Amino acid sequence: MNFNKKTIEDIEVSGKKVLVRCDFNVPLKDGVITDENRLVGALPTIKYLVEKGAKVILCSHLGKDASKSLAPVATRLSEMLGKEVVFARDEEVVGENAKKAVSEMKDGDIVLLENTRCRKEETKNIPEFSKELASLADVFVNDAFGTAHRAHCSTVGVTDYLDTAVCGYLIQKELKFLGNAVESPVRPFVAILGGAKVSDKIAVINNLLDKVNTIIIGGGMAYTFLKAQGYEIGTSLVEEDRLEYAKEMVAKAAEKGVKFLLPVDHRVAAEFKDVEATITEDQNIPVGNMGLDIGPKTETLYADAIKDAKTVIWNGPMGVFEFENYNKGTIAVAKAMADADATTIIGGGDSAAAVNILGFGDKMTHISTGGGASLEFLEGKVLPGIAALND
């Protein structure tokens, strides 16, 4: 995939109507936004376009369907920018209200369209809706990395009707850090993979085995790898149908000279509850117990590997992070990354949440804004929302 995409700074935007696809898919509780990270991430692109005298038309999805309105986002964005963001309340997204709001815009004005998923066509990338969206604007800017792996009307379809399609600052930053890490990393390059399932990370491991110096495995997926190596795992989570694959991966890593680190001890309990942990002596987990986090020896092993690295990518927690007794491994990895003299990249999703909760967010080089998108990027897949932009 070509990472050298044109950006907003490469084109003339003054006096133009610019349709910007943002990622405003934020959590709401009683109409209040509970996590504003995605709004903060969108501000640099919006501010640049406003300063350059563009007419800025923002669009985004919110939730899985039409049930939520972007009205609270318009209100909050207005406060953050210190400038009115006109909300075009319109069930058709591009209906009379939206057309009127856009026709009345002056240079530097901002309009936010209603949730793109109010239209059934959006997720099916049906040309009719793409054409309507494109008809509002002269230029398209994609700044929603979180949906770059989806070929929808507002991410890909519009580019069929607008010749100028470039990325905003957020996607530019994602391409810079994720792209460089995958294509030309400063070595040693360490990838840390956690989370519950091996099956979710198969393609990532496959792709990264050709690129990294060390792979570190934690979380529920570690037990499948350990069982494949002949260790006892008690009642821990295991994917029986992935044991053969797990064995192959470890062998493949050895063949390529890639270090493949698995836990050497564990924090375990008799059931899936936040009770005090028992720490195992070694890799084996006693009968009637399940692994819920990596143990202290493993923390040291992993921290040492991170300390020596120059590029680190992390995707997925080391244990059941929601349980206070089983968040130690995740904390240890986050701390090691925060202290490392390396380019540190958090691949969105649970790891990003963990790092922010722990207060290490500002110590990382880059926290990806897309869980699924960053995962597909690490799998080496082409992301349609980025492929559609001008080279």
Curated annotation (Swiss-Prot):
PROSITE patterns the UniProt entry points to: PGLYCERATE_KINASE
Pathway(s): Carbohydrate degradation; glycolysis; pyruvate from D-glyceraldehyde 3-phosphate: step 2/5
Highest taxon, organism lineage: Bacteria
Keywords in alphabetical order: ATP-binding, Cytoplasm, Glycolysis, Kinase, Nucleotide-binding, Transferase
Binding of substrate, residues: D23, F24, N25, R38, H61, L62, G63, K64, R117, R150
Location of the protein in the cell: Cytoplasm
Cited CDD domains: Phosphoglycerate_kinase (cd00318)
Catalytic activity: (2R)-3-phosphoglycerate + ATP = (2R)-3-phospho-glyceroyl phosphate + ADP
GO molecular function: ADP binding; ATP binding; phosphoglycerate kinase activity
Residues the entry annotates as binding ATP: K201, G291, E322, G348, G349, D350, S351
Top-level enzyme category: transferase
Protein EC: 2.7.2.3
GO cellular component: cytosol
Entry's family note: Belongs to the phosphoglycerate kinase family.
Subunit structure: Monomer.
Name under which the protein is recorded: Phosphoglycerate kinase
Organism (species): Clostridium beijerinckii (strain ATCC 51743 / NCIMB 8052) (Clostridium acetobutylicum)
